[in-house]
Amino acid sequence: MAHLLSTSCSMKVSPSEKLSSKCWNIGSTKYPMSFTQQTSKSAFKSLVHQRNNTQKLTVVRATTVPLNQETKAESGTSSFENNGNTSGRKRVMVIGGDGYCGWATALHLSKKNYDVCIVDNLVRRLFDHQLGLDSLTPIASIQNRIRRWQGLTGKTIDLHVGDICDFEFLAETFKSFEPDTVVHFGEQRSAPYSMIDRSRAVYTQQNNVIGTINVLFAIKEFSEECHLVKLGTMGEYGTPNIDIEEGFITITHNGRTDTLPYPKQASSFYHLSKVHDSHNIAFTCKAWGIRATDLNQGVVYGVMTEETAMHEELCNRFDYDAVFGTALNRFCVQAAVGHPLTVYGKGGQTRGYLDIRDTVQCVELAIANPAKLGEFRVFNQFTEQYSVRDLAALVTKAGEKLGLNVETISVPNPRVEAEEHYYNAKHTKLAELGLKPHLLSDSLLDSVLNFAVQYKDRVDTKQIMPSVSWKKIGVKPQTLRA
């Protein structure tokens, strides 16, 4: 039975003299390249190419239907189908479910017999369009992804297309779906993107912080028992010269002892937005009794999970560019096309890493073992620590097994960060819940490098070198080189 998937996402679409040649496609709906997101009560009007012209208001709608049917969204008003929780299964809302971590998680939870709802404004696809980037792996539209999943498994995933910064949209979505758990991936997740220029720095903070506050209010107003599973980042901690604990540290000062939130030393406007999120969530747990798990995730690599490997239309995105690509993914693509691995600076930057298959496993464990009402708990979500030099050496060794001649070069570091430092982060809580990690030494070839070789003809080598400088960020909007 077809599901009508609601949106009250409104967009102000900029007029264009050559509209037909400058369109962005989501499913069957076309959007001009240049537009401004509009939220109902937001003081911010962000993204790129804002204009003073009178702009047309368009209501965006989305549908999912079985593969052998076609459904046309009615014009005029939004509507929801509330199936009710008659199955007794837990209902999980995945905000940002069209993204890298969100899509893999949504499929994994659906397979595990959760009732899943994806909420997404699809803006991540727009970022690629604006910056001239593309996923290494071809990715289908979210509508086709969901239809294919239903065709293969018989399982339905609800879809609500809209902006969680628009509280009216979010409220209607909450009232419609009635989630037991909210998994919140729905944030601008790139540090380099947040450092391109002022407008993108502002967008990152506005989108991430206001969106999370809206989620907290929605839980308070419509679903007080709901468990928030929020994706944070290990980057909140920075690189202190002491061990990194899981969220909290017990200290003795002037003869008195207390357990306090671990100090935060964020290194970009993106990482700072995550710090603000953590503070806001901790406050509302204390003040309102919300239950929340903050997953401070390390750097994720890989593309394949058991579910995304079922069909090409379920394939996840694989970012390799200098804006959205993570270090290991970038190195594997560079090796595949014969480009030297680009190590930033001295290469001693050490971080926690995990396979995308472990991301979905961690989220499932957090859902199955929820926080108590009023509890704010923090899990450090990674499985192994590596320096950038270590990663380059691993990729070089793996490349040799495939007959690749892999070289490494040092390039000026575009970031402001320590290039040699102490790093020892604790990560025991998820292991205690039953996490069984996929280690990089066992999975580098099958999870990353083979995909890079398979799709190497899709690589745009102009996107390999760093293009965003932490020190050169300014007020003037920047267009990355094509």
Swiss-Prot record:
Optimum pH is 8.0-8.5. InterPro entries: Epimerase_deHydtase, NAD(P)-bd_dom_sf. The active site is at 233, 270 (proton acceptor), 274. Its EC number is 3.13.1.1. GO terms for molecular function: enzyme binding; FMN-binding domain binding; UDPsulfoquinovose synthase activity. GO terms for biological process: glycolipid biosynthetic process; sulfolipid biosynthetic process. NAD(+) binds at residues 100-101, 120-124, 163-164, 189, 207, 270, 274, 300. CDD domains: SQD1_like_SDR_e. Its main location: plastid. The keyword Chloroplast applies. The N-terminus is blocked. GO terms for cellular component: chloroplast stroma; membrane. Its cofactor is NAD(+). The keyword Cell inner membrane does not apply. It is an enzyme of class 3 (hydrolase). Keywords: Chloroplast, Hydrolase, NAD, Plastid, Transit peptide. It is found in: Plastid, Chloroplast stroma. Homodimer. Interacts with FdGOGAT (via FMN-binding domain). Involved in the biosynthesis of sulfolipids found in thylakoid membranes. Converts UDP-glucose and sulfite to the sulfolipid head group precursor UDP-sulfoquinovose. The sulfite is delivered to the reaction center by the FMN-binding domain of FdGOGAT. Belongs to the NAD(P)-dependent epimerase/dehydratase family. PANTHER family: DTDP-D-GLUCOSE 4,6-DEHYDRATASE-RELATED. This is UDP-sulfoquinovose synthase, chloroplastic.
